[in-house]
Design a protein with these regions (language model features):
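Well-ordered alpha-helical scaffold segments within catalytic/enzyme domains
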Residues: 43-52, 101-110, 159-168, 248-252, ...
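Extended, well-ordered alpha-helical scaffold segments
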Residues: 63, 91-94, 115-123, 175-179, ...
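Primarily interfacial, aromatic-capped hydrophobic alpha-helices that serve as membrane anchors
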Residues: 104-128, 215-262, 365
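Solvent-exposed loop and edge beta-strand segments that line ligand/cofactor-binding
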Residues: 25-36, 90-91, 95, 144-149, ...
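All-alpha helical catalytic cores of prenyl diphosphate-utilizing isoprenoid enzymes
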Residues: 3, 7-16, 28-42, 63-67, ...
């Protein structure tokens, strides 16, 4: 039976009754039924795998409402704090909301249950600890890395603990936990890919950055580091692991009649496939550029002109060496088009002024000739 409509009506009513602004209500609705809908529907999805599901429906709906409020509030408060100068009023609303509504609902549901509250506190500590990890401090193998990253979503285990307390029937809880683990591996690896730029700047622990030991977040530009990662197979391999786990979750959820979880897993597979296709096309483009840039100049007169150009540029470059990237990545002695153009600039006296203008422009832009080798430009 599809209990989603019942849950949706109840959540809409609960949100409408909250003493918060319309804007806040709308943001809650969007989060609950948007990016976090997997967790919103997880309790009723698990309920669908229970033979006699109707007798547990009321309590499970209560669990869905309270857990949705808590999880969405927790995540949105965290995002708001990052922009607190602009949204102080909204932060106050959400903090009040978490304390007075979400926690209160959980207390009403599991007031005297020691197991629930001990598990709750323990999992919250895991989430907090994982969120504080930084790439520069990480030491360990791939298994340890995944364990820490999965702790970011550790609260999902509380759904299973809660459902076991409500549903007094023997169902395959271990299989549910294993399926959730597969889903979250896929979700985390895709999320880390999407957050690469942000995590390079912040230094937050990221699956791909933790494996690339040659990345120096303190001395290199973000785009340069992204190119390093793309040039290796770290990102592609990680996303293949993500795809494998998303497919495992899709099959497992389907066998347990967890339709919404299966649907979200299907969307996850498609999103990963899209990224993998995009990366593959970018690599083909980069390889094509590399081949074109490695055509050796074999004309002696052009080589002589190129040497003059090289000498001119070296003599006129800034102390910071901003043209070094141009000379190396453009391919000193390679790519006859580049060679011809810069030779013509440097060979004739009248063109030196234009060359200086070009150098000034490149200098302002860091002299990065191959800046967009992995872009769609």
């Amino acid at each position: 039976m599809d209990y989603r409509k019942i849950l949706q009506e109840r959540l809409n009513q609960e949100i409408e009754n909250l003493s918060i602004s319309i804007e806040t209500k709308n943001s809650l609705q969007n989060a609950i039924w948007g990016s976090l809908s997997f967790y919103t529907c997880l309790p009723i999805d698990i309920l669908n795998s229970v033979p006699d599901s109707k007798k547990y429906l009321d309590q499970v709906i209560e669990l869905s409402v309270s857990s949705s409020f808590y999880l969405v509030s927790l995540i949105m408060v965290d995002k708001l704090i990052d922009n607190q100068e602009k949204v102080n009023g909204a932060i106050v609303e959400y903090l009040f909301f978490v304390k007075e509504e979400a926690i209160k609902k959980l207390q009403n549901l599991f007031f005297n249950n020691t197991l629930f509250w001990k598990t709750f506190q323990s999992l919250k500590c895991l989430v907090f600890s994982a969120s504080q990890c930084r790439c520069k401090d990480f030491e360990g193998d791939n298994e340890k890395l995944l364990t820490i990253l999965l702790n970011k979503s550790a609260l999902v285990k509380l759904y299973v603990v809660s459902m076991k307390l409500i549903v007094q029937e023997q169902i395959d809880w271990d299989n549910i936990l294993e399926s959730l683990k597969s889903f979250h591996i896929a979700f985390q690896l895709l999320d880390d890919y999407e957050d690469l730029k942000e995590d390079i700047r912040s230094g937050q622990l990221n699956y791909y950055l933790a494996q690339e030991k040659n990345v120096d977040s303190e001395s290199e530009e973000v785009e340069v580091q992204l190119k390093k990662l793309m040039a290796t197979e770290i990102v592609e391999n990680g996303l293949m692991i993500a795809r494998k786990n998303a497919c495992l979750a899709y099959k497992a959820f389907g066998k347990m009649s967890m339709k919404h979880s299966q649907q979200v897993s299907s969307v996850l597979v498609k999103e990963i496939d899209f990224v993998l296709t995009d990366i593959h096309l970018l690599k083909i483009k980069a390889e094509a550029k590399a081949k074109l840039s490695n055509v050796l100049v074999k004309n002696n007169q052009l080589n002589i002109a190129l040497l003059r150009s090289k000498a001119f540029i070296y003599n006129n470059q800034e102390i910071d060496g901003s043209w070094k990237d141009f000379l190396t990545l453009a391919g000193d002695g390679h790519n006859w088009i580049t060679a011809f153009v810069i030779s013509m600039f440097a060979e004739f006296e009248d063109n030196k002024k234009d060359l200086k203008k070009a150098m000034a422009w490149l200098g302002e832009n860091g002299g990065k000739y191959n800046q967009n080798v992995f872009s769609n430009d």
